[in-house]
């Protein structure tokens, strides 16, 4: 998978490397993402920009930590032939202020939280969801936990009772 990364309104950091590591770990747990023809863009931006995107595309008038915009449905992704032109999997946008606040509240690094949200976003682009049923949510969370474990990042859901 080819990654296009744009960084706006985030502090200096190893965001390209973090994104690449998150993508590799996610490909390891979701083989459909291992396709060489896939392209994904990841935007590190502000709460203000994510608020605009959330309002325009999801009709939710507030910022959120991560948004994903899939461009291939799950069946088409799984049927993708090895040869052919690049295919845009979708876009991911992360909101700095929300991500930083959540990381502080959880007592984890911004890098670890951003990694989790990139994994989460990539799984959404691959057709996974957590809204329709508890079973779907559990499946998606298990993939997130497995991908993050490959990177040495603790289970982000481990504090639930």
Swiss-Prot record:
Pfam families: YbeY (PF02130)
Gene Ontology molecular function: any one: metalloendopeptidase activity
Note accompanying the cofactor annotation: Binds 1 zinc ion.
One BP term from GO: rRNA processing
Cellular location(s): Cytoplasm
Binding of Zn(2+), residues: 120, 124, 130
Gene3D superfamilies: Metalloproteases ('zincins'), catalytic domain
Cofactor(s), by name: Zn(2+)
Keywords: Cytoplasm, Endonuclease, Hydrolase, Metal-binding, Nuclease, Ribosome biogenesis, rRNA processing, Zinc
Any Gene Ontology CC annotation: cytoplasm
Enzyme Commission number: 3.1.-.-
Function per UniProt: Single strand-specific metallo-endoribonuclease involved in late-stage 70S ribosome quality control and in maturation of the 3' terminus of the 16S rRNA.
Recorded family membership: Belongs to the endoribonuclease YbeY family.
NCBIfam families documented for this protein: rRNA maturation RNase YbeY
PANTHER family to which the protein is assigned, alphabetical: ENDORIBONUCLEASE YBEY, CHLOROPLASTIC
Name this protein carries in UniProt: Endoribonuclease YbeY
Organism (species): Erythrobacter litoralis (strain HTCC2594)
Lineage, top ranks: Bacteria, Pseudomonadati, Pseudomonadota, Alphaproteobacteria, Sphingomonadales
